[in-house]
Every structure is written in structure tokens, then in C-alpha cells.
């Protein structure tokens, strides 16, 4: 029994710590993109919303992963973690576009999770809830001031969970902005990933998110990661945004490519230890998108959405 709990602990720490401390790699690729915005799904309007001239045409909202942000970080020029993976996406976009045309806003949130190795940190639930509230606040503020501005949302690891949750609310018409205001969403290493939900560019993986795999063990894992609720998948998926959500996962990433059932999870927990480094290598891993890297692909995908809407 002690050995089993130890293995579970290894899996949980693996599946939740996921620190994206990666080296910036600035590459590009002419890959085709799937799930671009198509015909409007709702009632068409005859006149576009009127907004001030200073409003950007597009706002990119980026949600960093665990330990890659801070609650008091600067959302326009974040410095909380200079090695944050999201910087390898946001900085090229800021260099490519004028801030008058494209606003790039990085989510400032605590980005922690309490576990057996860091009892003094904010719990995963509290960190995630804080990030979700701040992202929704930014969406509301921009949409109220600039109703014609459209959004591209990108998240990594814990940030992907936040971005995915917000996208699911918007897609089910329960969000803070209308779905027609969202051009696209990219989730990198989403802990709530499920097959058939969203689009899956790049290399196919048949695993699921760690929160989905570990949902049956939620009560058992609380002593190991107190305040980290394993919520499973997102009921209803991404709704009308399904074709606009890119769910990106590296093979053998324990966060998003976990075993489908708990029994296999226990058997494979030790094997996942050696694969844990995969989660920190999206900026250099050639196995996610052949011929390019994840950050370069996302930059090109976002550029295509900005230029071609």
C-alpha cells in the first residue's frame, strides 16, 4: 500500500508541478492551420460595433504556467520569470505588430500550487481561480471599452487549464464575452485535455489530461496536493468554439498525455518520471510539430489569425 501511495504521489507531483522553464527558440514554419474561424454561428449583424480609434483590432491574452507569473507582474512587459515559455510567443508578436493594432497582454497571477514539497505555496485551486477571475476581468474591460476588438487566447500548463476553462464558458454562451469575439484559442499541455474535444494539430497523442485521469483519486491525493481538485474533463467541451481551439500536447508529457485509466496510471507512474522533462521542452521539442517548435507554430498560427481574421 505504501508503495502504491508513493507511486500516486510521483504521478501527482509530475502532473501538476510542470514548470515550463525552457530556452527561447525563435523559428518559424509555413504550416497549415486547422480550425480557423469560419462562417458566423450566431445571428449576423448588419453594422460592426462602434469603438474608439485607440482600440486595438486584436488582443492576444497569454496565460503562463506554474511558477511563470506573479500576481503583481506587468501584463504588458512581464518580468516575473525571464525564462517563461510564454515569452517565446508573446515577444515575437509584440515585435511583429504595433501595440496600437495588436495588444499583447500576459495574465498576472500567482501561478503556484501547494504540494508535499512546498506547503507554503498557494493551492492549485486558489491559483487557478485567481487566474480565471483576472482573465475574465481583462476580457470584460476590453470588450466594454472596445466591443469590436477580437481575442486570441493562449495558455501553457496551468495557464492552459485557465484558458481552456474560460474558452469553454464562452463557447457554451456562459462566458463574459460573446463567442464571435474570439478568433482562436491555443492550449499547450492542457491538464483537462480529452480526445475529440477541440482540434489537435501536430503529432497525435492518445493520452488524456492528468486532471481527467486522476479524477477518481481526488480524495486520495488531497494529502499530497492539498487544495488541488482533480475536476476531470470540461462538461460540454468548448461548445461553438470547438473548431477554433487548438489543443497541443507533446507525446509522453505527463500533464496532457496521461494514461486513460487509473490502473494504467499506477503502472506507468515510475516510467513517467523519466518523461517529465518533456513538459519543459516545448520550445525545442521537434516531436510535437515536425520541422518546427511549438512556440514557433503558435506564433505563426496567431499571425495568420491576426492578418486574415
From Swiss-Prot:
Cysteines paired by S-S bonds: 55-146, 249-256
Gene3D superfamilies the UniProt entry points to: alpha/beta hydrolase
Cross-referenced InterPro entries: AB_hydrolase_fold, Cutinase/axe
Residue runs in coiled coils: none
Active site: 157, 253, 279
Top-rank taxon, per record: Bacteria
Membrane topology: Single-pass membrane protein
Keywords: Cell membrane, Disulfide bond, Hydrolase, Membrane, Serine esterase, Transmembrane, Transmembrane helix
Pfam families found in the cross-reference section: Cutinase (PF01083)
EC category name: hydrolase
Enzyme Commission identifier(s): 3.1.1.-
Localisation: Cell membrane
GO cellular component annotations of the record: plasma membrane
Record field: transmembrane: 5-25
GO terms assigned for molecular function: carboxylic ester hydrolase activity
PANTHER family the UniProt entry points to: CUTINASE 4 (PTHR33630:SF9), CUTINASE RV1984C-RELATED-RELATED (PTHR33630)
Function text: Esterase that may be involved in cell wall biosynthesis and/or maintenance. Hydrolyzes pNP-butyrate (C4).
Record-stated family: Belongs to the cutinase family.
Protein name as annotated: Carboxylesterase Culp6 homolog
Originating species: Corynebacterium glutamicum (strain ATCC 13032 / DSM 20300 / JCM 1318 / BCRC 11384 / CCUG 27702 / LMG 3730 / NBRC 12168 / NCIMB 10025 / NRRL B-2784 / 534)
Amino acid at each position: 500500500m505504501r508503495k502504491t501511495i508513493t507511486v500516486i504521489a510521483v504521478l501527482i507531483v509530475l502532473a501538476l508541478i510542470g514548470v515550463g522553464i525552457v530556452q527561447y527558440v525563435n523559428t518559424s514554419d509555413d504550416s497549415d492551420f486547422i480550425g480557423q474561424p469560419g462562417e458566423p454561428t450566431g445571428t449576423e449583424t448588419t453594422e460592426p460595433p462602434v469603438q474608439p480609434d485607440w482600440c486595438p483590432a486584436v488582443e492576444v491574452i497569454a496565460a503562463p504556467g506554474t511558477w511563470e507569473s506573479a500576481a503583481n507582474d506587468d501584463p504588458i512587459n512581464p518580468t516575473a520569470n525571464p525564462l517563461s515559455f510564454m515569452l517565446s510567443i508573446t515577444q515575437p508578436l509584440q515585435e511583429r505588430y504595433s501595440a496600437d493594432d495588436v495588444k499583447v497582454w500576459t495574465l498576472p497571477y500567482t501561478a503556484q500550487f501547494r504540494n508535499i514539497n512546498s506547503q507554503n505555496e498557494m493551492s492549485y485551486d486558489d491559483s487557478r481561480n485567481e487566474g480565471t477571475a483576472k482573465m475574465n476581468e481583462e476580457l470584460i474591460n476590453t470588450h466594454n471599452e472596445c466591443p469590436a476588438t477580437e481575442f486570441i487566447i493562449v495558455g501553457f500548463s496551468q495557464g492552459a487549464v485557465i484558458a481552456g476553462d474560460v474558452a469553454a464558458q464562452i463557447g457554451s454562451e456562459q462566458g463574459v464575452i460573446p463567442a464571435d469575439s474570439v478568433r482562436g484559442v491555443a492550449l499547450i499541455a492542457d491538464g483537462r485535455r480529452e480526445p475529440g474535444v477541440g482540434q489537435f494539430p501536430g503529432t497525435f497523442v492518445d493520452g488524456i489530461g492528468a486532471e481527467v485521469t486522476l479524477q477518481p483519486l481526488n480524495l486520495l491525493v488531497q494529502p499530497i496536493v492539498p487544495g488541488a481538485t482533480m475536476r476531470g474533463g470540461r462538461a460540454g467541451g468548448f461548445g461553438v468554439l470547438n473548431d477554433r481551439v487548438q489543443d497541443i500536447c507533446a507525446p509522453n508529457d505527463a500533464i496532457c498525455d496521461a494514461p486513460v485509466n487509473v490502473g494504467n496510471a499506477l503502472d506507468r507512474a515510475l516510467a513517467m518520471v523519466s518523461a517529465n522533462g518533456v513538459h519543459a521542452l516545448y520550445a525545442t521539442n521537434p516531436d510535437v510539430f515536425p520541422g518546427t517548435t511549438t512556440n514557433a507554430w503558435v506564433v505563426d498560427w496567431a499571425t495568420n489569425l491576426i492578418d486574415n481574421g
